[in-house]
Amino acid sequence: LGEILRLAVRDPSYMMIFAGFFSCGYQIAFITAHFPALVTEMSAPIDPLGWCGDLGIETTAALGGFAISVIGAANIIGTLMAGWAGKRFGKKWLLSGIYAGRSIAAAWFILTPITANTVLIFSFAMGFLWLATVPLTSGLVAHIYGIRYMATLYGIVFFSHQVGSFVGVYLGGV
């Protein structure tokens, strides 16, 4: 086990997986902790005659809660599709696309006015990419190092995800 750990920490591929999952945790925790409050405080007023009113969303606080539920629903779809795609296409390229997609979605959201429509679009896009990294990351670790060491090496990568989560929540509140 010691030998494979030394090999992994010297492997640029493993360190990229480690760093990627750190950023994944950062993004997810940052959005989970701070996005509903951002929507509540910064969103344009809700149009009671629009689609929000049809869904019973009458306040920006309700829109923030709805946004998290959209992220959750889209996450189911995105994660299943990522697992399916990971069997057919290169996992590292799919992971790169997911991380790039998150960056594009975040940049788009930052550059647009915060309305119910932009919140919904961002929530779906981010939700679709939310945990789509998990089957690809674990599959990539297993592919590179084999099933025998997958649990240990993926566990270390997952630890980086949790550290990234802490940093994302903490820095968002500073």
What are these regions (language model features)?
Residues 1-3:
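Flexible cytoplasmic inter-helical loops of multi-pass small-molecule transporters
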Residues 6-83, 134, 168-169:
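Extracytoplasmic gate region of multi-pass secondary transporters
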Residues 14, 91, 147-151:
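Cytoplasm-facing, short amphipathic helices at loop-to-helix transitions on the intracellular side
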Residues 21, 68, 72, 99, ...:
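Small-residue-rich transmembrane alpha-helices and their cytosolic helix-loop interfaces
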Residues 28-30, 62-143:
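C-terminal transmembrane helical hairpin of 12-TM major facilitator-type secondary transporters
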Residues 35, 39, 140-141, 145:
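Hydrophobic alpha-helical interface/terminus motif in multipass membrane transporters
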Residues 42, 46, 88-89, 114-115, ...:
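Membrane-interface elements of multi-pass transporters and channels
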Residues 131, 144-174:
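A late C-terminal transmembrane helix in Major Facilitator Superfamily
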